[in-house]
């Protein structure tokens, strides 16, 4: 096992994950905190949520030219979230009668910073009306600040629902996603119901950055505080299935007596599932995160025990509706989060099928 692949975050007595978790959103507004602080934003977010759930109402006045939209996404993953997101986005744009031109680049998460940078600069040179991107690393943040400060391109930040406090005077056009903290709290509540106090567990993070902080540390904070669970180890991964497999094996070699592993993403979880099967450790409970097609298949096979399922197409639809409102000169909320549902391997095929129809109502058709 190549230790260079992994960074063991926790390996010493006295580490306090709960104290670290209080800093999870340092520098960010929590989703509900932001809406509480700015009631007019809550009203706009609620109105957008209603539009997402409703049938599309076409644009009142067609645009003179196609609007230019550029998308740079970390799409090369087992998780189908990003691909479905674009599919639902385009289908809703079509139903809203919005004339558009889309340029999209899918990259590997965490690995292709150079490619992302080139694609982003190309999007700016082409004078895109809207740029859809994500925010996970410091390098991403520097680029976002460049866009906010020096271009007319309107920025949609995907997969983040916690506005950056430093940008309060000039926020992006829209933060859109499924609130990582809320999804992680829902999983923490379910694990808390299932296991007794002082249960041993391990965590497999995503790559270093925002997603690991919010999905991982939010969970750690809640189960340690509410259930007195005892964290034995935590590893950053490379956000891939292989690194999830490697991290799970490394973790269990040092701490074999855990009752569950908390995984922060689909790819990491499915890699850990392979490791557990190879080691004959099906007694260890493992979760998914996101509830895409690969996770739901694993749940129905009994390989995964539980996941928090995003109503996936909500965010693609929300982006299309926000652009429509902007073209109609209507105010657009700063932030939008889609809905979650908890799914377990005990759920009936009928319930899972109903949730799939709701979550993938555009991207499956």
Curated annotation (Swiss-Prot):
Residues 1-23 form the signal peptide. Keywords: Periplasm, Signal. Pfam families: Peripla_BP_4. CDD domains: PBP1_LuxPQ_Quorum_Sensing. SUPFAM superfamilies: Periplasmic binding protein-like I. GO terms for cellular component: periplasmic space. It is found in: Periplasm. GO terms for molecular function: DNA-binding transcription factor activity; transcription cis-regulatory region binding. It comes from the Bacteria. Belongs to the bacterial solute-binding protein 2 family. Binds to the signaling molecule autoinducer 2 (AI-2), a furanosyl borate diester, (3a-methyl-5,6-dihydrofuro-[2,3d][1,3,2]dioxaborole-2,2,6,6a-tetraol). This complex then interacts with the LuxQ sensor protein. This is Autoinducer 2-binding periplasmic protein LuxP. The gene is luxP.
């Amino acid at each position: 096992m190549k230790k260079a692949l992994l960074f063991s975050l926790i390996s010493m007595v006295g580490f306090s994950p709960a104290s670290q978790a209080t800093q999870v959103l340092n520098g960010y507004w929590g989703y509900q905190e932001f809406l509480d602080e700015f009631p007019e934003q809550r009203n706009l977010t609620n109105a957008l949520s209603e539009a997402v759930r409703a049938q599309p109402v076409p644009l009142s006045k067609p645009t003179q030219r196609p609007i230019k939209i550029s998308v740079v996404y970390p799409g090369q993953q087992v998780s189908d979230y990003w691909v479905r997101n674009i599919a639902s986005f385009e289908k809703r744009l079509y139903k809203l009668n919005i004339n558009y031109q889309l340029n999209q680049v899918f990259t590997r998460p965490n690995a292709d910073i150079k490619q992302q940078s080139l694609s982003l600069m190309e999007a700016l040179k082409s004078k895109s009306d809207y740029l859809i991107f994500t925010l996970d690393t410091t390098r991403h943040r520097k680029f976002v600040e460049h866009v906010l400060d020096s271009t007319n391109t309107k920025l949609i930040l995907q997969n983040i629902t916690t506005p950056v406090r430093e940008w309060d005077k000039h926020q992006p056009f829209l933060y859109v996603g499924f609130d990582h903290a809320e999804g992680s709290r829902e999983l923490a509540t379910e694990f808390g119901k299932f296991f007794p106090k002082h249960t041993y567990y391990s965590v497999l993070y995503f790559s270093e950055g925002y997603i690991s902080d919010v999905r991982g540390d939010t969970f750690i904070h809640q189960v340690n505080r509410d259930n007195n669970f005892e964290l034995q180890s935590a590893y950053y991964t490379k956000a891939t299935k292989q690194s999830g497999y490697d991290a799970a094996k490394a973790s269990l070699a040092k701490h074999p007596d855990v009752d569950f592993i908390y995984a922060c993403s689909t790819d990491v979880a499915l890699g850990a599932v392979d490791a557990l099967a190879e080691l004959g450790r099906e007694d260890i409970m493992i979760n998914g995160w996101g509830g895409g097609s690969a996770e739901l298949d694993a749940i129905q096979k009994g390989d995964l025990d539980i996941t928090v399922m995003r109503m996936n197409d909500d965010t693609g639809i929300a982006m299309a509706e926000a652009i429509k409102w902007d073209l109609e000169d209507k105010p657009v909320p700063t932030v939008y989060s889609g809905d979650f549902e908890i799914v377990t391997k005990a759920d009936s095929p009928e319930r899972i099928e109903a949730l799939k129809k709701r979550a993938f109502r555009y991207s499956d058709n």
